[in-house]
Amino acid sequence: MTLNLCVLTPNRIVWDSEVKEIILSTNSGQIGVLPNHAPIATAVDIGILRIRLNDQWLTMALMGGFARIGNNEITVLVNDAEKSSDIDPQEAQQTLEIAEAALRKAEGKRQTIEANLALRRARTRVEAINAIS
């Protein structure tokens, strides 16, 4: 039995295919979803989406949004999403270093909050590449 997973951003469909299982980062922690999961709607945190296709796991970096699960269908609407295979490792590492430097230089509450958010996004992209599946 499978689940239909659809990952959408405001600009494109990132994923629309059947999967065996997912592990989703929510604002209250990670949840695993298998076929016949109870219906829920949840906020999606900045984090990794793990997708199981048969015996293979794939990862995707999600940049926050929400998900609806029910009737073996999962719809994930996020601000942005990238498959790990589409992320350039060198560019992701550079972005992480820039975000870390920006946080060190941040002055004031607003700059610190924005720098922390940029750092979380950058770390998520690096984690998506390095995820052990």
From Swiss-Prot:
The UniProt keyword set, sorted, is: ATP synthesis, CF(1), Chloroplast, Hydrogen ion transport, Ion transport, Membrane, Plastid, Thylakoid, Transport
Protein task: Produces ATP from ADP in the presence of a proton gradient across the membrane.
Where it sits in the cell: the answer is: Plastid, Chloroplast thylakoid membrane
Q: Which PANTHER family match?
A: ATP SYNTHASE DELTA/EPSILON CHAIN, ATP SYNTHASE EPSILON CHAIN, CHLOROPLASTIC
* The keyword Amino-acid biosynthesis is annotated on this UniProt entry: no
Gene Ontology cellular component terms for the protein in this record: chloroplast thylakoid membrane; proton-transporting ATP synthase complex
Q: Which domain of life is it from?
A: Eukaryota
Say which family it is in: Belongs to the ATPase epsilon chain family.
Q: Please give the InterPro entries that the UniProt record associates with this protein.
A: ATP_synth_F1_dsu/esu, ATP_synth_F1_dsu/esu_N, ATP_synth_F1_esu_C, ATPsynth_dsu/esu_N
Q: What is this protein called?
A: ATP synthase epsilon chain, chloroplastic
Q: Could you describe the subunit structure of this protein?
A: F-type ATPases have 2 components, CF(1) - the catalytic core - and CF(0) - the membrane proton channel. CF(1) has five subunits: alpha(3), beta(3), gamma(1), delta(1), epsilon(1). CF(0) has three main subunits: a, b and c.
